[in-house]
């Protein structure tokens, strides 16, 4: 007859094996349920993205790593191998280039927001008639984003061309690498006014300073598109993020930050 300690050993073996199997299964399930997605996002969408991420992570368990910058610079980084799964641009042009270069997944490109451009000064009563203010130039510096790399900068150039002030204002223009830097120029008073995203002013304090909502007829619509990159093609978290951007929750958040439309109204 076996000794008592031998019986205990034989009884424990099946239990230990079962427990080990459960641990393996739980580990496998956890790995498939939660993943990570890396996204490159246009600078104007920084605050909106951070709120979207909070909701997405709470709903799905997936984790999001976000990098922010000008659309042009993010595009260049992606073409040079930056490890992004999703590209969220502030224009249509660069996502189209990604698609044409077969660096993105066909059929995934869509417009997630339409931006609005404003002329803003943190000083109260800085101007009453914005076009006249720009013509008279009672300021030392006017901030815009770099038109070559930032869609909001290109829109600002279009506005100034529309009112005939692009060339006259050249000596006073200070250009930010991104719309985020442009906004900082104005907030820090390094520029007395600037063309920025309406969403930035809304987050800062939409009742502070002086604001001109630029008529849409003065610049091409700032349709902001996202595309799933090849790196994220088989990433469940990346595809979940793309789906989330089209959800009612995301559209509501996007609109609350001052963007005209979400996915359902544009597509």
Residue ranges and their predicted role:
Residues 1-14:
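N-terminal secretory signal peptides that target proteins for export/translocation
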Residues 16-29:
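Bacterial N-terminal signal peptides
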Residues 13, 25, 124-127:
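Short N-terminal or domain-adjacent regulatory/targeting segments
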Residues 30-34:
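Sec/Tat signal peptide C-region and signal peptidase I cleavage site
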Residues 10, 19-21, 85:
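Secreted/extracellular small peptides and ectodomain modules produced from precursors
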């Amino acid at each position: 007859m076996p000794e008592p300690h031998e019986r205990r050993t034989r009884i424990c073996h099946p239990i230990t094996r079962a427990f080990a199997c459960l641990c393996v299964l739980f580990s496998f399930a956890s790995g498939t349920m939660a993943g990570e997605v890396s996204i490159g996002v246009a600078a104007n969408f920084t605050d909106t993205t951070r709120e979207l991420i909070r909701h997405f992570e709470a709903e799905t368990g997936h984790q999001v790593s976000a990098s922010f910058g000008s659309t042009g610079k993010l595009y260049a980084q992606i073409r040079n191998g930056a490890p992004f799964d999703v590209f969220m641009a502030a224009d249509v042009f660069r996502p189209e280039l990604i698609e044409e270069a077969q660096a993105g997944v066909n059929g995934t490109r869509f417009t997630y927001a339409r931006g609005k451009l404003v002329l803003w000064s943190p000083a109260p009563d800085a101007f009453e008639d914005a076009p006249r203010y720009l013509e008279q130039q009672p300021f030392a510096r006017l901030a815009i984003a770099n038109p070559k790399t930032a869609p909001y900068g290109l829109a600002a150039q279009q506005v100034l061309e529309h009112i005939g002030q692009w060339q006259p204002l050249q000596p006073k223009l200070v250009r930010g690498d991104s719309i985020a830097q442009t906004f900082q120029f104005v907030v820090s008073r390094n520029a007395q006014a600037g063309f920025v995203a309406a969403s930035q002013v809304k987050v800062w304090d939409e009742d502070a300073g002086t604001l001109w909502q630029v008529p849409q007829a003065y610049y091409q619509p700032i349709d902001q598109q996202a595309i799933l990159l090849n790196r994220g093609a088989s990433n469940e978290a990346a595809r979940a993020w793309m789906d989330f951007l089209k959800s009612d929750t995301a559209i509501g958040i996007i609109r609350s930050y001052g963007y005209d439309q979400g996915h359902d109204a544009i597509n």
